[in-house]
UniProtKB/Swiss-Prot annotation:
Entry GO CC: nucleus; plasma membrane
Function: Cytokinin receptor related to bacterial two-component regulators. Functions as a histidine kinase and transmits the stress signal to a downstream MAPK cascade.
Modified residues (Phosphohistidine): H448
Induction and repression of expression: Slightly induced by cis-zeatin (cZ) and dihydrozeatin (DHZ).
Modified residues annotated as 4-aspartylphosphate in this record: D783, D930
Organism: Oryza sativa subsp. japonica
The protein's name: Probable histidine kinase 3
Domain Response regulatory: 732-854, 880-1016
GO terms for MF: phosphorelay sensor kinase activity; protein histidine kinase binding
Superkingdom field: Eukaryota
SUPFAM superfamilies associated with the record: ATPase domain of HSP90 chaperone/DNA topoisomerase II/histidine kinase, CheY-like, Homodimeric domain of signal transducing histidine kinase
Amino acid sequence: MDEMSCGGGGGGARWKRARVAGMGEGKAGGGGGAAFLGLERVGMVVRMLPVPEKVSARARVVRGSLVAHFRGWRVVRETWWWVLLLWILAGSLGSFYLFLFMNAQSLDKRRDSLASMCDERARMLQDQFNVSMNHLQALAILVSTFHHSKTPSAIDQMTFARYAERTAFERPLTSGVAYAVRVTHGEREQFERQQGWAIKKMYSSSNKKQSSPGPGPGDAAVAEIREPAEEYAPVIFAQDAYKHVISFDMLSGNEDRDNILRARKSGKGVLTAPFKLLNNRLGVILTYTVYKYELPAYARPHERIQAAIGYLGGIFDIQALVEKLLKQLASQESIMVNVYDTTNESPISMYGDDTGSGMCHVSVLNFGDPSRKHEMHCRFEKKPPWPWLAITSSFGTLVIALLTGHIFQATVHRIAKVEDDFHKMSELKKRAEDADVAKSQFLATVSHEIRTPMNGVLGMLQMLMDTDLDTTQQDYVRTAQASGKALVSLINEVLDQAKIESGKLELETVPFDLRTVCDDILSLFCGKAQEKGLELAVYVSDQVPQILIGDPGRIRQIITNLVGNSIKFTERGHIYLTVHVVEEVMSCLEVETGIQNTNTLSGYPVANRRCSWESIRLFNRELHSSEKSFAPIASDSISLVISVEDTGVGIPFEAQSRVFTPFMQVGPSIARIHGGTGIGLSISKCLVGLMKGEIGFASKPHVGSTFTFTAVLMRAHCKGNDIKSSEFKGINALVVDHRPVRAKVTKYHLQRLGVKTELTAELNQFISKLNSGSLTAKLVLIDKETWLKESHCTPLLVNKLRNNDKPDSPKLFLLGSSASSPKGGSDTSREHNLNVIMKPLRASMLQVSLRRALGGVDKVHCRNGVVGNSTLGSLLHKKQIIVVDDNIVNLKVAAGALKKYGAEVTCADSGKKAITLLKPPHNFDACFMDIQMPEMDGFEATRRIRVMERDLNERIERGEAPPECASIQRWRTPILAMTADVIQATHEECLKSEMDGYVSKPFEGEQLYSEVARFFQNHDQVE
């Protein structure tokens, strides 16, 4: 690493080591030539090294790379002066080209700026001109309406002049207006008699040249009587400034005559050529034709000529118009503007001086008359500035090129060091990757190996609990069980984190009942919630299908993690789990409501869950866009929104940004007080991502938190096991609870049982219905908090029910929890002899409670309740069961658990032995098969057993079965997979190997009962 330590011309420690080894004679650090000589000799020695015939391929690659490295180094050292010279030359040419390029860009930018300013002025000039044209056209319509369409006319010279003067602000660009009427030769005499004057013709004072608009002050016009003609256009109305043109025939001037003929033929406004106004400024006349009636747009020219009855003219001061425009658009960089009439070959200047040179831009003007052409020419008043940006940039480029050449030599000498560092880093990177793979494999292996004895420990502890223990010993065993389960949970989290980091975490796709999963989670935290006095509840929307397809284990893991955190950080109030579809949540987001955040499950304020739903907007848009692209695939998908709301301590604002960071907690005190590793939320976020969802939260310190995540699952086309029982169909129930959210939860669980439910908020309403005889409910469920709140009504209610001798009198239930049972309230049910249902509510637990109260038989299948030994004993008594596991401890635990329930157990320590024992015919009723065993795993053993059973069934069908199978129609032994990690035994693998289900190790009463009950009640061998 210290190659450059010897200084000089580039000789270094590397070459010094080569010389010491006898591979060079030059002195280290004695100059570039000596170093180069040593380097060349090293290359020669490398080339001359003998290559053994059996040398490894890696050694050949290393030797080849060394030879190539030394050769490339020598070539660079010999040619670097020429390279430097070429570099400087290229830098000089490049800087010159950069100057030309940037200067051209500057000119183009200046040209574009001029074009933009010129076009803007031209556009505004056209717009202002068009506005005045529109007002003139409106004045023409006014004359047609009130002069020609009224008899007698509503307009005279005084009215016209006054109106024109008072509306002059609408025509700021016109200096005057006049109206001439169309008179034929036959109408002339009568017209002159009506007007009181004769029609005159217009001449200019200089050589009788026609001018417009006629004689005026200062032009010495000669007024002569108009000679006879086919038709005339005498002016009858004019603005006061131009009333001297009244009685003059506008057709007597060539320019005006041509204007009028074009105007009435086209039906549009037409312009004259520029001429000098009375104030010696240039202007034009715009002429509009007035018609007898409104003509369609497609009218022909001869139809327009016949319908013409008059002509309205307006004089425009072009110079004033342009000057006003330039004042409005005064910019930082002024420009010179010239306006030309380019109708003829020789353009006529209408505004501006013709002087000026340099860059020029021409914008075409359109004043509405297609027969006349106008242009605006624009130039900058100032000369362009020096292109300092191009000069400095090109000079800077040249300086950079020289500096680059200056450091080129040092760069060449550092190439070797960089290459060495690169090879070392590559080797370290490979080692790090290998270490990461080894770490993941180690975690997976060690975690599994730890879980196996831990399952044995937990199983033995469970068996120890079934022995005769005193209270102290039971407490010790429960503590050991809790510690063991916590350790297994921690191991599972670490394993999940390792799988996530290695990208090997996969999800199952199996049918499951989400409502049952939620009930199981509530059962898991029921004890902790009651110990802390918390209200714990779940609500699943009716829009959520009963059976979904997804990974129930991972969904359970996410919800369990969120609810567990809420239990951990909540000391009062409630924890509320809700499940909706995305469409329901989106409708809530779009409609803002004024509901207070205290209208909650327990009445405590909560964090606004809308904040945690905001990410769902983006999720919903992405979901719909993907559904459009893959409509056939996404037709069965459903997007769920699952929220966990609590009234805990909340998350400090400064810690909210690192909530999902692995191994991060709010502070060190959290780990001391509540424990945990800080990876639960990180794992949950990764699992949500695998489900194509999003996760977010809203939290307010000292108020609470609401965590929300989305998941995309599939709809199941099969029907699930509906929990609704026929014994509750047609039964009505009344729920009395003053908290709407809590009443909604109770109604949800009752409806799952098929009970029609009505809600009321006060006991008085229930008593009123009871007194009036309008009560149809057979079941009345009153929340204990409401019962205590309205305790003044309870004696009356109890007496009323006791004195009611009717057989159909309602059954009264109190919904109680530790949260709603203050001191002294626990004796309420005992005092009044009431039925009590403890919360949190679950459908199965509620089913059992209602059945007992109604006098039904208490069935044993209770998923969330505690399954007694007698229940499993009735199923497993005298059953022949074989347990297959390669681990002796697991065999002992499984055998002990099954023997506890009266089963006769046979153990096998390998898959091959299981195949031998289960070769039909045999006397076993079921088999519990471990899926991870050496030589042959449980899946392969099961497949071979099924092959033997199929062969026997074919022989039975052909009548070739042995005598032992004479009374059996079809042989099939139930086989259940045993695993420490339920996720590994996926539903697809079980189906492929024809297994019938799975149980987790160690055995738990509830799960064991739910599995074996299916086989020993419905899938027994047919004898």
